[in-house]
Amino acid sequence: LSSKLNSRSPAFTRIELVVVLAIVAVILVLSWPAFKNALTKRDLTQTMNNGRELYLAAFRMATDGAANSDSNLAWPGDYPVNSLAEYSSRLVEKDYLKPADLQRMLSAPSAACTVTATGSPVTTTLTGKSTLKIYKVKRTDPSNTIFAASSNYIYDTELNAKVEPFGDAGFIVVRKSGDAGVYKKGQATAAGYDNNAARFQAEIGALPGATKGEVASGDGATVLAGPR
C-alpha cells in the first residue's frame, strides 16, 4: 500500500503545480491593466516633475534677464527662435542646464530624446522624440499661460491613444506660474469643463497670446518645433 501511495505522489505534485501556475497566470492577466496603469501614472508624474525642473531653469534665465536688462536671457517666446533645439542652446550656453540634465528632462520610457551640445557658442542638437514640448511664452503673458506640456497633448483636442508618450492615458501641463499637474483625458478639452472657456483656461491653461475666455483647438504656431 505504501509503495502505491509513493508512486502516486509525484503525479499529484505535478497536477498541483500545474493548477498553481494556472492560477498565477490568471492573476497576472487580471492584474496587468492595473499594473500598467500604475506604471503610466508613475511616468506621467515623473514627466511633470521634469517639466517643472525645466521650467525653473527657464524662469531663472528670464528673471536674470529682466533684472539685468539682458535680452539674451528671456522667455522662449521673446527670442527669435522657432525650435526646441534653438531654445535649448540658450539654456545650455548660459549654463542654466547641462546637456545630460536636459536629455533626462526631455525623455520618458516611450519617448527618448538625445541631446548633443557642441561648439562655442553652443549649438544643441536634439534627436529622437521629446516627451515635452515648450510653448512660446513671453514676458507679457499671464501666469496661467502654458509653458510646457507632454507631447501627446494638443491644446483643446482629445487625446489620441496611438500617440506617444502616454497615448490617451493622461497628459501633463506646466504653466508660467510654475504650477503643474497630471490630467485625465476627459480634461483635455473645454468640453470637460462644461464648455466654460474661462474655467478651462484657469485650470488647464491658456495658449501664449490667447484672449481671456476664448479657446481655439490646436497649438497653432505657439509651440517650439521639436526634434524630427
Please give the residue ranges for each predicted region.
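N-terminal secretory signal peptides that target proteins for export/translocation
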Residues: 1-7
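N-terminal single-pass transmembrane signal-anchor helix
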Residues: 8-39
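Conserved hydrophobic/amphipathic alpha-helical signal-anchor segments
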Residues: 29-86, 227
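A structural signal for short, well-ordered beta-strand segments and their strand-loop junctions
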Residues: 31, 47, 69-74, 98-110, ...
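Well-ordered, non-membrane alpha-helical segments in soluble/globular domains
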Residues: 82-93, 127
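Acidic, glycine-rich loop-and-strand cores that form catalytic or ligand-binding grooves
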Residues: 94-155
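C-terminal accessory segments of extracellular proteins
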Residues: 154-228
